[in-house]
Every structure is written in C-alpha cells, then in structure tokens.
Amino acid sequence: YIKESNNINIFSDNKINHELFDMSDIKLWEKKYLHHEFKDFLNGGQISICEPIPYLFEFPLFNERFCNELIEIMEENNKWSDGRHNDKRLSNGYENVPTVDTHFNQIGFEKQWNKIVFNYIAKIAEKGFVGSHTSRINMSFVVKYTPSGQNKLRPHNDSSLYSAMVALNKRGEDFEGGGTRFIRHDYKHLTQKPGYCVIFPGRLTHYHEGLETTKGTRYIIVSFIE
C-alpha cells in the first residue's frame, strides 16, 4: 500500500518530460499541468462536476499537456505487461482481471501520483462520497487498449473503496470504440475529453466492463483507492 507523503521534492531519472516528475514547486507544476477549472477550484472557484448515474462523478483534472507527456513517457519506457493473469509485479503473482498496462512504480511516477490523489482527487471524492476519507492507494497504472492486443475488459468490481479513471486521449481522433459500461445501471460512459477524471465506488456497487476499442489506441489511468 502507498500512504500519503508530505515530500514534494520528487524527481525522476526518466529520459523525457522531466518537468512532469518535478513537483518541488507545486504551484508551478499545477500551472503547467492542471486543467484551468481545477486550478480555479483550488483557489475557491467553481468546477463542473457531472453525475450521470448515482455516485459516478466526472470532473476536469489535467490539461492535454499532462496527458500527452504521460503517454510519451509510457511509450518511451515500453514496460507494458502482457495482459495475463500471472503477474510478477504483484505480491501474490496473480491478477484476477488483467490488463495490458504499466504501473506507475515502474516509471518512477508512484510518489507523484500519490500526491495527485491526496491533493486533488480526494478533494472531489470527499465531497461526493460524504463521510468518506482517502487513506491509501492500492494500485495505479496506465492501461493500453488496441484492437490487435487487449481491446476490452470483462465485467468486474474493482478492489477499492473507490476507483479513479482518467482519459488520456481522444475518442474519434486517436481511437474508436472504448468506454466503460456500468452494468447494473445500464449506462455507458463515453468521455471524449482527455484529462477528465471519473471516480466511482469500487468493490460494492458499480459492476462494470471495458468496452471494445475497435480502432487506434486508447490510453487511460486507473487508480484503486481506499
């Protein structure tokens, strides 16, 4: 488990996009990478939060620079898993619902994402899920969907109190298809906006599946949070 850290002097030896890793000046980092609405929200302003079904909240979090640079880092590192159940990265060596993905700790972005969850995502979660408190992060990674590789994900519940998903590229331009179907609610979530975050309850109520990506490559961040 990853718990909250107050350390903001975080750097990485990644070869590209070093500024994304450097959160030593948090205000400068926010200026570079947060969506303008979320920056306004941090300063006491308003933010657009959509709730299309009960307890699913979508809001603008990152700008497109963040999304593009993170995709570039993931492809430069090229540490994608094979999408099989056996996974040596996990303590028990087994993933029940595997995806083709790269964990943030594989690219040196785990501490940064930890800070993003506690500083930004948790602020929205604790407004939407009244009475909840974000205490730790179970796992965080970027998933890659392609027609020739893993193109969808079977129905499942997440191993989390709540989960966060962030779209990193554009439906209709970078890929076709995709999205998430919440089965019990009979609702398909098809965001087209890179940098928008969706949060929803994990292990109990929001049974869901990843819909087929039929063209191009779809990238999303997934984070399981307690």
Where are these regions (language model features)?
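Non-heme Fe(II)/2-oxoglutarate
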Residues: 34-133
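A generic signature of intrinsically disordered, low-complexity regions enriched in glycine/proline
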Residues: 26-29, 44, 105, 160-164, ...
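Catalytic core of non-heme Fe(II) oxygenases with the double-stranded beta-helix
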Residues: 114-226
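Intrinsically disordered, low-complexity regions enriched in Ser/Pro/Gly/Gln/His and often acidic
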Residues: 20-22, 73, 106, 138
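Homeobox/homeodomain signature
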Residues: 11, 19, 47-52, 87-94, ...
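Fe(II)/2-oxoglutarate
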Residues: 1-57
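Acidic-enriched, low-complexity/disordered segments with a strong bias for Aspartate over Glutamate
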Residues: 13, 22-25, 40, 82, ...
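Short non-domain terminal segments
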Residues: 9, 19, 36-39, 60, ...
